[in-house]
Amino acid sequence: MSEDRVTNIVVAGLGGQGVLKASGIVSDAAFRAGFDVKQSELHGMSQRGGSVSSDVRFGREVFSPMVPTGEADFLVVVAPDQIEVNRHQLRTGGVLIGPDAVDGKKLTNKKSFNVALLGVLSRHLDLAETVWLEAIRAAFPEKLHAANLEAFALGRKGV
């Protein structure tokens, strides 16, 4: 990542899938790495089952929380039916991380699927693994640390 470049990430899925939790973890990890971070949320029908997306932007200096349409470097999608709904956010050459990027059957806690996708995302970002782990621990109560750290490791290793 160039020093002045802003990294644009859109996390999308359905209400109840941890989209906002995932984008919060990305934001926290980037902040812990020393970047200026902006985040915005589009809840839509954010009750369980409705479309939800959240933009995360980080870099040396970020002015707007919104990822301009067609400029997302990364599109992380938790629900398969949300891929086409959100594909227009991705820039040409951007990276789509969809639900098929992780084998959910290998997770001990299926609710940690969103964090497993962050593990995949982490392979593409120049953020130290330690800031990710700190952000994950900060996002969940202690009793959920092991399951979420395991999910992150699964995605990060690409298993």
Description of each model-found segment:
Residues 1-159:
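Active-site cofactor/cluster-binding pocket
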